Amino acid sequence: MQQSVIALLKELRAYALEKSLRAAIYYHEEDSYLMRFANSAISLNTNEHLVRLQISVYDGNKHADYEMIADPNQIEPLKRGIDTAAEMASRAQALSYTPSIPCYRETVIDMQAYDPFLAGITNPERLEFFNTLARGLETETIKLSGVFSNGTTITAQISTESEHTQYFACTDASITAVLSHQKLKWEVNALQSAQAKTELNPERLRAELAFLVRQYSENPAVQLPLGKYTVVFGAAAVGDVLDMFNWVGPNGGMMKRGYSFLKEEQIGQPVFSPRFTLTDDPRCQATYPVSHDLTGKRRERFPLFEAGVLKAFFWSQDDADEFGREATGHSVYHN
């Protein structure tokens, strides 16, 4: 698969060079599947295969991006996309800084986060997963709903600055299972994500749901009075908090624009509990890692907080260009 993607990018690079452009081309392909359940039955079963191309053209302090849905087998519309990006760049207002154009120093093929078995999971297997997690929990008044989604994402990059390319492939799955009482109107849910097929565990989801159903069915309802409480977050909630944290926390660009709750002078100071440590580690398979960022910078282990102490802000390349900082390998699709 990577050979055809790389060949396409090299052909588009050659066209950009023929037009005397300085450009970077980003390829993004998704092959996704979704099975949805409602009222203990399949309500939707679908899949989608999309290819998107982003073309970035640079002209000194001018820069323009153009995105398009692409058919890799139709090269002429893609070349016209390059022409459009070039025209947009020529008409763009100059920035107050000079944006860096990616220059890839080596060819990278990174499939550490790709699992062919998860990519090839079938509809009967998705159905059996849900049947297993709901076994013995459904009744006339307790109904199952939820979603099983999975897919493969391929990203690749090239620029006019070198012949080298980058290619990344990853697989992922996300499952949400909900049991709801038709009369009492309560519902409980359990979530699971996976990067490889071996991580799928319907029995664990069933155990979580069974525990919650038992609490709602056997214990009396209570209303908590106003006050201070300790709330324990599960993995999914922690993930949502960290996703928000990405924007209002140790994000260098957002900090300089005044959107972060942190300040640069707090580096080296304790800002959280000593029990809190947060590190961006591209070796951690559970985070769908990539070895290099979109600009070609090799990603390394990057401590953000250690024992509650703020260690550093991360910087994407564009933010680093704008504010005169050094990029930290965080020009990625997800942090």
Question: Model segments located where?
Answer:
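Short acidic, glycine/serine/threonine-rich loops at helix termini
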Residues: 35-39, 153-168, 186-192, 241-247, ...
